[in-house]
C-alpha cells in the first residue's frame, strides 16, 4: 500500500472533504486508492481548523464540483452542510458521507457502511435524493438538535473519554449528573398548541439518533418535511423516573412526562439560555425558532435507508 494518497490525474468530479484528524488513517488512504483504481475521479481536500469545511464547500461549488463527501464525524458533516446551505440552491453540490471519528449518529441512522471503502462507494455511486435540512436560528442541522439534559451531558463529556468509551460515555456522564440536574423552564409553541414546561430534555429530530446511538426520534424521516418533537418533563423521584422511562418506551402523544409530536416548526422562549447540541455541536439559545427546509439538499443515502420515506 502506498504511503501517501496519490493525486488524481485532474481535480476530480467529486471532492472528499476530509477532517484533518483522519487524513493519516491507513484505511482511509486505502479506500481512496481503491475507488480511484475503480475509475472514480476523486480529489481530496483536508480541513485544518474551524471554518475550513464551509470554505471548501464554497470552493467546490465555484469549481463546478457536483458532489462533495464529508469525511469525518457528525461535526464535520454539520459544518459542511452549513457551508452547502450558504450557497444558492442551483450551485449547491450533492452530499455524500464517509463516517469517521467517534460520533457518527447521522451516518448510523442512515445505515451507512462502517468500512471506509464501502462507505465511499455509497457516497460516490448512489443517486442522490432530496432531503430536508433543519434550521435553528441562523444555524443548520441535518440530524438532530437536543436541548437540556442531553446537551449538558454531551458538552461536559471530556473528549478523551468520548473517544475511549464511544456511546457509553454519554450514559456514564448521565448517571453522574442526573441527580444534580436543574430543569429549564420555557415556553414551547408549535402549530397545534403550546406548552409551559420544566424541561428535562428536548429533541428536534430530522434524523433519529444522537449521543452515541440514543434513539430520540425513532419515527424520523429526512424527506417528510416534519420535525420529530420530543418533550421530556423534569422528574423528582424514582417513581416518576420509572414512569418517564415507561413513557419513553411507548412515546405517547401526550404523556405525563413525555410527549412525542411531528411538527413543521417549533418556537422556544425562556429567560435563561438553553444548552443545545446541533448534530453534536454545542451552542446556547434563550429564544429560537426551529424548522425544516424541505428538499433543500441532495444526499447520497443508501438504498432502503430507514430514514427515507421511499415514496
Curated annotation (Swiss-Prot):
What are the UniProt keywords, alphabetically?
ATP-binding, Cytoplasm, Kinase, Lipid biosynthesis, Lipid metabolism, Magnesium, Metal-binding, Nucleotide-binding, Phospholipid biosynthesis, Phospholipid metabolism, Transferase
UniProt subcellular location: Cytoplasm
- What is a single Pfam family found in this protein's UniProt entry? YegS_C
Q: Which GO terms describe its biological process?
A: phospholipid biosynthetic process
| Named cofactor requirement(s) | Mg(2+); Ca(2+)
What are the GO cellular component annotations? cytoplasm; plasma membrane
Q: Known EC number(s)? A: 2.7.1.-
**InterPro entries reported in the protein's UniProt record:** ATP-NAD_kinase_N, Diacylglycerol/lipid_kinase, Diacylglycerol_kinase_cat_dom, Lip_kinase_YegS, Lipid_Phosphate_FormReg, NAD/diacylglycerol_kinase_sf, YegS/DAGK_C
Q: What does this protein do?
A: Probably phosphorylates lipids; the in vivo substrate is unknown.
Query: What is the name listed in the Swiss-Prot or TrEMBL entry for this protein?
Result: Probable lipid kinase YegS-like
Amino acid at each position: 500500500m502506498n504511503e501517501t494518497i496519490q493525486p488524481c490525474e485532474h481535480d476530480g468530479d467529486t471532492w472528499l472533504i476530509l477532517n484533518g484528524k483522519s487524513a493519516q488513517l491507513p484505511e482511509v488512504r486505502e479506500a481512496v486508492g481503491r475507488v480511484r483504481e475503480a475509475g472514480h475521479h476523486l480529489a481530496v481536500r483536508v480541513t485544518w481548523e474551524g471554518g475550513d469545511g464551509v470554505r471548501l464547500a464554497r470552493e467546490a461549488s465555484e469549481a463546478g464540483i457536483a458532489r462533495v463527501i464529508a469525511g469525518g464525524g457528525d461535526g464535520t458533516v454539520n459544518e459542511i452542510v452549513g457551508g452547502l446551505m450558504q450557497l444558492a440552491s442551483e450551485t449547491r453540490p450533492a452530499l455524500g458521507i464517509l463516517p469517521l471519528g467517534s460520533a457518527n449518529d447521522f451516518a448510523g441512522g442512515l445505515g451507512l457502511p462502517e468500512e471506509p471503502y464501502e462507505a465511499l462507494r455509497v457516497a460516490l455511486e448512489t443517486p442522490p435524493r432530496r432531503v430536508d435540512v433543519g434550521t435553528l436560528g441562523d444555524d443548520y442541522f441535518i440530524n438532530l438538535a437536543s436541548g437540556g439534559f442531553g446537551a449538558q451531558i454531551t458538552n461536559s463529556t471530556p473528549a478523551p473519554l468520548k473517544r475511549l468509551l464511544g456511546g457509553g460515555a454519554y450514559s456514564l456522564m448521565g448517571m453522574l449528573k442526573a441527580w444534580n440536574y436543574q430543569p429549564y423552564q420555557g415556553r414551547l409553541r408549535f402549530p397545534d398548541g403550546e406548552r409551559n414546561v420544566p424541561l428535562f430534555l428536548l429533541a428536534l429530530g430530522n434524523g433519529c439518533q444522537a449521543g452515541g446511538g440514543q434513539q430520540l426520534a425513532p419515527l424520523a424521516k429526512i424527506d417528510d418535511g416534519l420535525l420529530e418533537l420530543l418533550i421530556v418533563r423534569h422528574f423528582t423521584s424514582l417513581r416518576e423516573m420509572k414512569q418517564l422511562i415507561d413513557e419513553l418506551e411507548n412515546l405517547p402523544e401526550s404523556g405525563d412526562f413525555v410527549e412525542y409530536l411531528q411538527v413543521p416548526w417549533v418556537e422556544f422562549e425562556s429567560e435563561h439560555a438553553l444548552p443545545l447540541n446541533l448534530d453534536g455541536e454545542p451552542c446556547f439559545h434563550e429564544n429560537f425558532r426551529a424548522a425544516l427546509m424541505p428538499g433543500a439538499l441532495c444526499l447520497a443515502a443508501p438504498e432502503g435507508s430507514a430514514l427515507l420515506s421511499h415514496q
